Regions:
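A Lys-centered signature of the CheY-like receiver
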Residues: 106
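Acidic, metal-coordinating helix/loop segments flanking the phosphotransfer/catalytic sites
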Residues: 39-57
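Conserved acidic carboxylate
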Residues: 16
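Two-component/phosphorelay signaling modules centered on CheY-like receiver
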Residues: 19-38
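Hydrophobic/aromatic residues positioned on beta-strands within the core alpha/beta folds
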Residues: 84-86
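Acidic catalytic/metal-coordinating carboxylates
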Residues: 68-71
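Active-site residues of response regulator receiver
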Residues: 61
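Non-catalytic signal-transmission and effector/linker regions of two-component phosphorelay proteins
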Residues: 1-11, 95, 109-127
Length: 127
């Protein structure tokens, strides 16, 4: 199955506090055939969406206006929902618990996003 087939029709949660980046991610996800089902620009909204929305996969900005997103990652992980961290600081900046987890370096390109989301989904499925 190709990367585009894997992503086609998926419901995606975007957690990002910068509105321009949010819009860019939304456009990229639409180009990949995904549907954005939620966009959270702050920690509280991210937690609410992570707990209640039907989500196939998520992209999480690590730093939400000074608040770290890792409790949201815990919620998604507990629900069995794959996700990708987006960080300007690099994967090495992730805490030990999340070292080696799927991440993409900002600024994100559509290819980076597709590869990261595809990897997160494959790892969650164990394939």
């Amino acid at each position: 199955m190709s990367q585009s087939e894997v992503l086609q029709g998926l419901d995606v949660l975007v957690v990002e506090d910068e509105s321009m980046i949010c819009l860019l991610l939304e456009d990229m996800l639409k180009d990949l055939g995904c549907k954005v089902v939620g966009m959270a620009g702050n920690f509280k909204h991210a937690v609410e969406l992570a707990e209640r929305e039907r989500i196939d996969v998520a992209i999480l900005d690590v730093n939400l206006g000074g608040q770290l997103v890792f409790p949201v990652a815990d919620i998604l992980s507990g629900r069995g929902i794959p996700f990708v961290f987006a960080t300007g600081a690099g994967a090495g900046s992730l805490p030990a618990q999340w070292q080696g987890h799927c991440s993409v370096q900002k600024p994100v390109t559509v290819d980076m996003l597709a590869n990261g989301l595809g990897r997160a989904i494959r790892e969650q499925r164990g394939s």
